[in-house]
Amino acid sequence: MVSKHRQLFWFFVICMVPFQFLEAQTQFISLKDALETRGTVIFFRHALAPGYGDPTNFQVDDCATQRNLDQRGREQSKQIGDAFKSLDFATDTVHSSPWCRCLETARLMDIGEVESFEGLGSFFEGHVDRQVTLKLLSDKLSTISNRDESPAIMITHQVVISAITKLVTSSGEGILYDLKGDRSLRIRLTEND
């Protein structure tokens, strides 16, 4: 008879194989190379904000009713900004979800003027309409794809990034999205990532 520990071990091994295969299929790009692409967007998921979703009394204009960055999230935001600054990158505008954790991430990155944009809001728990949000974002993306400029920078939520890029992201993770080629690449902030 096989022990329960051995059964559990094999269960986890079998479950992890598809994830390792998917990770192996994911393509990466350095931040330096990502910043040299034109007509693209760099999406960043907001930095670490412990918890899940938002409280039931959520109001977009009241940070006290939202899940917010903790100290690690604030440090992570600054580290992301430092990676951009180490490459002498600055932009006129960083587009951000109106959620406080996204706005704070964008401000702490400190690489450009932060502009709140409803097309980056989270529709995870129905606080905003998914279709309306993605239509606003799609309209914004269509104006970006034809410009011959460095990537637009957008700070948003897992559900928004996944809806556009088909990739799941961790807190503070960046994705380069090539609008013309409908291609997504995970960004390595440093050579050690």
Where are these regions (language model features)?
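Active-site-proximal alpha-helix that buttresses catalytic centers in soluble enzyme cores
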Residues: 26-118, 123-126, 167-185, 190-193
